[in-house]
UniProtKB/Swiss-Prot annotation:
The name this protein goes by in its record: Cytoplasmic tRNA 2-thiolation protein 2
Family: Belongs to the CTU2/NCS2 family.
Gene: ncs2
Organism: Aspergillus clavatus (strain ATCC 1007 / CBS 513.65 / DSM 816 / NCTC 3887 / NRRL 1 / QM 1276 / 107)
SUPFAM superfamilies, A to Z: Adenine nucleotide alpha hydrolases-like
Pathway where this protein functions: tRNA modification; 5-methoxycarbonylmethyl-2-thiouridine-tRNA biosynthesis
Length: 374
């Protein structure tokens, strides 16, 4: 008996109705999910096969999860790949995941606590280890941050060690007045928290859930903020200044493609906190550079996805310059204190004579200080 005739067959399998157009190709749900999985599979191949690393012993990777779509989808995909590998009679050495959840309500006051989300994560992905922390736990995991706060902050801010860690961090963040500086500082704090935790549990690297769209926006924002040198580790796969490998397995997927994948799996809907739609009434001057670049990439990416993808591809070709071991690092962000001529620079050389004595801040961190406005 002949099969049912399809009105819009999938171009890959031709056995099911196509439901989505993926880069000019009509695919069914299964083929679409396979397309997304393969993009991530290629990026994790080195860890799966343990290329250029020991094939014995654990290979632990840390996955920071924000309950956002991208990091949740990355966990879902990597979990499926790990389970598939373990089911083989002769599996590859592979890797193991530890998931770090930074409670979103401690990062943004507009984000509600998501206790049920953490419980659902553990129930949905029982084969992995999970840890939940607050942003102010950076004091506990990275004690050196305490010395940096007074150096970085404005003259009117005094760090009170007798206060609770939460109150100390809230007071420090409240002293930062511009939107761009607040976002910049929060990103640095989150990175330092993630790095400190990864080192504590002896991870080899960190896998970030940044899509191509996010990486393109980050590239443009970093250049605008004077952090162009950080692109080699904030956008590119490879070694970071912290002695950990940074990887971005979703770098070949647009944000819309990641969102489509998430819609296929009901278990993710209860975990993911949806993004707030951008407000049309907010003034541009009240947006951070990061928010402006994300809006730009998202709107232009809908019209010209190939052009936006080229931003990330071009950035991924950048190579970090060889920095001598004795070159000082920025005490806040960890970047090297070298200018384009290879000369050591200090924060004061960036044009701000009010940097406190003893502070070793790079040019970009000097610009983010409360006394300096973008």
């Amino acid at each position: 008996m002949p099969g049912k005739e399809l009105t819009d067959p999938c171009v890959d399998c031709a056995d099911a109705e196509a439901i989505l157009t993926v880069r000019c190709r009509r695919l069914c749900q299964d083929c679409y999910a396979r397309f997304v999985n393969f993009k991530v599979f290629k990026r994790m191949e080195n860890y799966r096969l343990r290329r250029n690393m020991s094939r014995t012993g654990p290979c632990k990777l840390l996955l920071p999860l924000s309950y956002g779509t991208s990091s949740s989808v990355l966990l879902h995909i990597l979990n499926a790949q790990i389970q598939h590998e373990r089911a083989k009679s002769h599996p590859s050495p592979g890797f193991e995941l530890h998931v770090l959840v930074i409670e979103p309500s401690t990062v943004s006051t507009s984000s509600p606590p998501h206790d049920e989300g953490f419980d659902l994560l553990q129930q949905t992905f029982p084969s992995h280890s999970f840890t939940r922390v607050s942003l102010h736990n950076v004091f506990e995991l990275d004690p050196s941050i305490q010395d940096v706060l007074s150096q970085f902050s404005s003259e009117g801010f005094t760090d009170d060690a007798t206060m609770s860690d939460k109150d100390r961090l809230d007071a420090f963040r409240a002293s930062i007045t511009t939107a761009t500086s607040r976002v910049d500082v929060d990103y640095i704090l989150i990175t330092r928290l993630v790095v400190a935790f990864a080192k504590k549990i002896e991870c080899r690297g960190v896998v970030w859930g940044d899509s191509d769209t996010r990486l393109a926006a980050k590239t443009l924002a970093n250049v605008a903020k004077g952090r162009g040198s950080a692109i080699t580790w904030q956008v590119c796969d490879g070694m970071s200044p912290f002695g950990l490998e940074f990887s971005f397995p979703l770098r070949d997927l647009y944000k819309a493609e990641v969102q489509n994948y998430a819609s296929f799996f009901p278990e993710l809907a209860k975990i993911i906190i949806p993004d707030e739609p951008p407000s049309e009434n907010i003034l541009t001057k009240n947006l951070s550079i990061d928010e402006l670049m994300m809006r730009y990439v998202q709107t232009q990416g809908e019209k010209y996805p190939g052009i936006m993808a080229n931003v990330t591809r071009t950035a991924s070709k950048l190579q970090a310059s060889l920095v001598p071991a004795n070159v000082p690092r920025c005490s806040f962000c960890g970047g090297s204190m070298l200018n384009q001529d290879g000369q050591i620079i200090m924060g004061g050389a960036a044009g701000n004579s009010e940097v406190r004595q003893g502070a070793e801040l790079c040019y970009a961190c000097t610009r983010s200080r409360p006394e300096v406005s973008y």
